[in-house]
Amino acid sequence: MKTFLPSKFIVDRIEDRCIKCKVCITQCSFDTHYYDEDDDQIKVRNQNCVGCHRCVTFCPTNALVVRNNPLEYRQNANWTPEMIEDIFKQAETGGVLLTGMGMDKAKPIYWDKLLINASQVTNPSIDPLREPMELTTYLGRRPDKAAFDNCGNVEENITPLVKIDVPVMFSAMSYGAISLNVHRSLAQAAKNMGTMWNTGEGGLHSSLMEFKDNTIVQVASGRYGVQNDYLNSGRIVEIKIGQGAKPGIGGHLPGEKVSADVSLTRMIPMGTDAISPAPQHDIYSIEDLSQLIYALKEATHYRVPISVKIAAVHNVSAIASGIVRAGADIVTIDGMRGATGAAPKVIRDNVGIPIELALAAVDSRLREEGIRNQASLVISGGIRNSGDVFKAIALGADAVNIGTAALVALGCHLCQQCHTGKCAWGICTSDLALTKRINPEIGAKRLTNLLRGWSLEIKDMLGGLGVNAIESLRGNRLHLRGVGLSAEELKILGVRAAGE
């Protein structure tokens, strides 16, 4: 069937710079560039270009330019080019449109409408270069009170808290969705910075057991790789109920990405689609969730906190309250801008709510019910920089997870082709010819640098507030002001308008 789809991008080659080295051909995993022997020229298939910029980055003579196709549709506010092209695709395939990464629509980004306070005159600021600043964060359940014996020993069992040196962790991204070299980069960077990385729902590769003190292992609806050794190889065990990019449906790893090594780790046949059920089939109520939480606590000998991850949806505050009362030590909330390796486009773009509103609502609800101390709040889904981290903690988060930002640090250009298994940067692929493009040592260094830079910036902002510890910022919304927000939005966020 002839396609009606135009090329998304046009690749221009500056001929007097091109030395015909064929680097562009070897670097492009989408067969955009090819060599024509008859004409002795390197030519381009524009329809294959996904805009990943791999060829541009590695061209030794800067001979390539990738630009948007200037093809213009007749202007129509209702029928945008994206709407038209989506219909073309479904008319040609008859299937669900899949995409990767997070929602890219122009929905409100509340981080950009929140501004941070600073000390002036009456409350002196602190110079982080000359005075100690504390970013250490503890995750887990804190008791209402502790009983001590005559020797000063605690009389009751308390779930151990997990200490992280920076309030930033790496989001759940499964082996298969991303390559083993990316997993190793994340794990090593987490160890370097004294924080945590998350295996995602695809199990833990045997070569990464050395990082178990910095590992969060996940139990999702597919239960891939879940067995006793796996559960006891993590510092935190996370039950995944949902994720921000696709609330209400299960994970989907195309068979093209299920290599021999991935199949061994996930405990599924090679080359088969790994389709997780939408629900966890042993969880249909808060009571069922509580049973699984305590089953995992028993399996791990009450040695580690149990986290429950949910998507930011309507009534999220009531759901989070139930999760805390069910016994969870950590609640992780993933917002609608959270990314994924593969999701139906219609769900990614239309389901869920912004993480800023969900976080503020959940923190307020738990405080009102007097149970905020019983669980830590971790949020994810759209954290782009240290300013977002700072504002999230002021809104009530104990820590944040980053996924897309971490992948960008490794070279991701957000071409949204994660689901194809052809990632030219070697990130979201199981193709051994592509995965070797990620050097784990260099990747770990880049991620370590990212977190170290953010840590320094957070300390600068804390110092500007006159605060020397991240705990003094947590949930302190008086340090935030809103700009361009409605009265209802300000009320939900719990912040005042700028100027008040």
From Swiss-Prot:
Its EC number is 1.4.1.13. Its cofactor is FMN. It is an enzyme of class 1 (oxidoreductase). Residues 7-38, 40-69 form the 4Fe-4S ferredoxin-type domain. Keywords: 4Fe-4S, Amino-acid biosynthesis, Flavoprotein, FMN, Glutamate biosynthesis, Iron, Iron-sulfur, Metal-binding, NADP, Oxidoreductase, Repeat. [4Fe-4S] cluster 1 binds at residues 18, 21, 24, 59. [4Fe-4S] cluster 2 binds at residues 28, 49, 52, 55. It catalyses: 2 L-glutamate + NADP(+) = L-glutamine + 2-oxoglutarate + NADPH + H(+). Coiled coil: none annotated. GO terms for biological process: glutamate biosynthetic process. It comes from the Bacteria. GO terms for molecular function: 4 iron, 4 sulfur cluster binding; glutamate synthase (NADPH) activity; metal ion binding. The keyword Glycoprotein does not apply. Belongs to the glutamate synthase family. This is Archaeal-type glutamate synthase [NADPH].
